[in-house]
Amino acid sequence: MIKPIWMSAIAIGVFAVCTIVLPMPGQRVVAQSAGSYVNAVDLDIVPAERDNYLAAITENGMAAAKEPGCRRFDILNLASDPNHFFLYEVYDSEAAFQAHRASEHFKKYAATTAKMVAKRESRPMTVTASNSVAK
C-alpha cells in the first residue's frame, strides 16, 4: 500500500520532535556509511505496559549495540506522546540485521513485548548519504 506523502513527512518529522529516552552505555560511536542497512520502527505501546516495554527494549537495545554488525540502536520517544516509540537501528548489512533478529536477546524481546505493542510499523531502508561522523 502506498502511503500519502504527508505520512512519510510525519515519520521523518518524528526525529524533529522526539527525545532520546536512554543512551546505550558503551555503544560505539561510528559513522553511518552509504549502503548501511536501517530498520526504522514506529511503535504505539499499550499505556499500562509502557514501563515494562521500556525495560524490555532497553535490554534488547543494549545487547544489540554490542553485536559486531550493529552501528547504531537508538530508542526515541515522541515528546508529545509517552506511549509512542521510534527505533532507529543501523547495521553494516541486511545480513547483520537478520543475525540480530536471530539472536536470543531479540527473541526474548519479541516474546516479552508481543502483547505490549498496540501498533508496529517497520520500514527497512538503506543509507544513501550521511553527515554522521565518527568521533
Question: Where does each model-flagged region fall?
Answer:
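Short, well-ordered beta-strand segments in beta-rich or mixed alpha/beta enzyme
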Residues: 36-44, 74-101
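N-terminal targeting signals for Sec/Tat export/insertion, comprising classic cleavable signal peptides
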Residues: 36-66
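Glycine-rich beta-strand-turn "strand-cap" elements at beta-sheet edges
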Residues: 4-6, 16-35, 75-80, 110-135
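An amphipathic, aromatic/His-enriched active-site/gating alpha helix that lines ligand/cofactor pockets
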Residues: 5-8, 22, 58, 62-71, ...
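Short phosphate-engaging motifs
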Residues: 49, 83, 105
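Non-catalytic surface loops within mature trypsin-like serine protease
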Residues: 45-47, 93, 126-129
